[in-house]
UniProtKB/Swiss-Prot annotation:
Protein name per Swiss-Prot or TrEMBL: S-adenosylmethionine synthase
GO molecular function, one term: magnesium ion binding
InterPro entries per UniProt: ADOMET_SYNTHASE_CS (IPR022631), S-AdoMet_synt_C (IPR022630), S-AdoMet_synt_central (IPR022629), S-AdoMet_synt_N (IPR022628), S-AdoMet_synthetase (IPR002133), S-AdoMet_synthetase_sfam (IPR022636)
Residues that bind L-methionine: E57, Q100, D242, K273
UniProt subunit comment: Homotetramer; dimer of dimers.
GO terms (BP aspect): one-carbon metabolic process; S-adenosylmethionine biosynthetic process
Class of enzymatic activity (EC top level): transferase
Amino acid sequence: MANDYLFTSESVSEGHPDKVADQISDAILDAILAQDKYSRVAAETLCNTGLVVLAGEITTTANVDYIQVARETIKRIGYDNTDYGIDYRGCAVLVAYDKQSPDIAQGVDRAHDNNLDQGAGDQGLMFGYACDETPELMPLPIHLSHRLVERQANLRRDGRLPWLRPDAKSQVTIRYVDGKPHSIDTVVLSTQHSPDIDLGQLREAVIEEIIKPTLPAELIKGDIKFLVNPTGRFVIGGPQGDCGLTGRKIIVDTYGGAAPHGGGAFSGKDPSKVDRSAAYAGRYVAKNIVAAGLASRALIQVSYAIGVAQPTSVMVNTFGTGRVSDATITRLVQEHFDLRPKGIIQMLDLLRPVYEKTAAYGHFGREEPEFSWEATDKALALAEAAGTEPVAALA
């Protein structure tokens, strides 16, 4: 890739139909883990006009009112009016959960001689990524895209823009010069709204109240292209506008396309599923590599075989930004991080009901106290082992 280029990422709000599905799935996961932390959960959700379908595989001793959890999640998001196409009070909720296959369970539950040798719940490959473009060590385009739709939700909730409705999408294009963010080129924001708002008034308010306060002043250089509701009217949205499904926003959930994705979604899955837990561990590893000053960009890939505890591969790529070799960093990762599935669960304390909060505005790059995978507590040890200087904030 050339050093001067445009790069774009997108995000969606909590009211987007796919995110409604993700949040219901993770709310159900949390409700189960709160009672039985060793549950096996793969909770999938479909939501459409006036309808929510809950399906998947759950093995647990917990007694959870799944229908009530789904309704409370829809209420929290803001779908509390039949005019919005789905109303938490009146929507139909169908439940069709099965138990986890015993063929899968025999590999996942096996302990061998060491209780950390729990097998992976499936084969697969997962990626983690970090870079020094933001204080959170995230790519700038996805970071800004998340903040835009998060602000849209905040202004909707506090009543400052009362004509906003829950569904929204954002997209940010950044101009890079010499491989670093230089300026903001284009911002797209489409928001659902009440039918009585004038489009000109909406566009002015969105630019002045949502977009401009979110953009870093140092990246405003020349004219930025603002595209607000470019198709015009956006009254029908949410699950009425599109059928929502768990796991359809995996790029929004991660790095906005700035890093590869192994293909496995996160929401609704307990941490025995390496699709989720190993991706969280990958973020933890990559963020600590960058925080340690070992590189300004770091990508890690890990892979697993079902029923086998040790990863089948570990790879680190620092894209030529490493202060030491990628082979050295890979060795340090294997020395300082336990990437067996149960080792990850213990390292990041993942048997907690913390997942509903992850299901909107990104699983990574948010300094939430529950997000243990965002900690940089290994950075100093990595820096010492590699002979590098950690970033100033950690020194």
